Design a protein with these regions (language model features):
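Ser/Thr-Pro-rich, acidic low-complexity intrinsically disordered regions of eukaryotic RNA-binding
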Residues: 29-30, 101-103
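Beta-strand/loop nucleic-acid-binding surfaces
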Residues: 109-133
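Short, acidic/hydrophobic/Gly-rich beta-strand patch recurrent on exposed beta strands
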Residues: 60-62, 103-109
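Short boundary/loop segments of OB/S1/cold-shock single-stranded nucleic-acid-binding domains
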Residues: 67-89, 129-131
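Structural detector for short beta-strands of small beta-barrel domains
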Residues: 84-100, 140-142
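OB-fold/S1-family RNA-binding modules
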Residues: 5-74, 132-241
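Short, structured patches in soluble enzyme cores that scaffold and shape functional sites
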Residues: 96, 106, 116, 144-146
Length: 241
């Protein structure tokens, strides 16, 4: 049976790497259930969702296509790691920015130390996070390159390239967590900034990037929509502006 799957006869349970967080956990859970049901709509399977004590989304799958559905969910969302192995790449999310490291949760907590953040430029972790608009709960990809007395981790080239593409862009980006796309669109519309943005990029389930137009300042968008959203926000100032 595939890792991440537990089951008994006629039902399979899958714990995913989708973290349920924020003040409105019920809303986030319902949103994820609706999203997954839509993704599995062509399969014969009944979907139920619950939250584990560690705040991961767990799916109970029942039906003719339950195993196919389980494999899809593991591929789509990943499963929490129970240990870190050298040479492996893991999906996870940003948890916090300490004095000497980015803290990442891959199912277990790992640290990306300051010396592994050189690719983002000079500065302390909190300064680097601010420069690239990074906030807690953003999905990330890390590589474990050593496991001895402690686990040594770095961000993958793919991850670093994404952040640098934001920084080198000709427009600002506003990074938002704990909000749906429709909530962000509504906040932008109600504050009269509909013509000031190009699009809203999806980063995760409730994590998005608002792509500003060339003459729009990201901090101004944050000041306008911030009071309407129960979110943390980061701003990436495009260097090519």
């Amino acid at each position: 049976m595939v890792s991440g799957i537990t089951g008994r006869k006629s039902m399979i349970k899958v714990i995913t790497l989708q973290h349920i967080y924020g003040k409105n956990r019920e809303r986030m859970t319902d949103l994820l259930k609706t999203l997954v049901e839509n993704e599995l709509k062509n399969l014969e399977v009944k979907v139920e969702i619950s939250i584990t004590p560690e705040n991961w989304a767990e799916f109970s799958l029942e039906g003719e296509d339950e195993e196919v559905s389980a494999n899809f969910l593991i591929s789509r969302y990943g499963t929490p790691a129970v240990k870190a192995e050298a040479g492996r790449t893991y999906r996870g999310f940003l948890q916090a920015f300490g004095d000497n490291a980015f803290l990442v949760n891959i199912g277990i907590p790992v640290r990306v130390e300051t010396e592994e953040l050189i690719a983002l430029g000079s500065g302390r972790p909190a300064q680097l996070a601010s420069r690239f608009g990074l906030i807690p709960h953003l999905p990330v990809e890390v590589e474990v390159f050593e496991v001895n007395k402690k686990v040594k981790t770095r961000f993958t080239k793919k991850q670093l390239d994404l952040w640098w593409s934001w920084k080198k862009a000709g427009t600002d980006r506003v990074i938002v967590n704990a909000a749906t796309r429709s909530e962000i669109k509504s906040a932008i519309k109600k504050t009269g900034h509909g013509r000031d943005i190009y699009e809203i990029e999806r980063i995760g389930l409730l994590e998005h990037a608002i792509v500003c137009r060339e003459n729009t300042d990201g901090p101004g968008i944050v000041a306008a929509i911030g009071p309407r959203l129960k979110s943390e926000m980061g701003v990436v100032i495009g260097d090519a502006r």
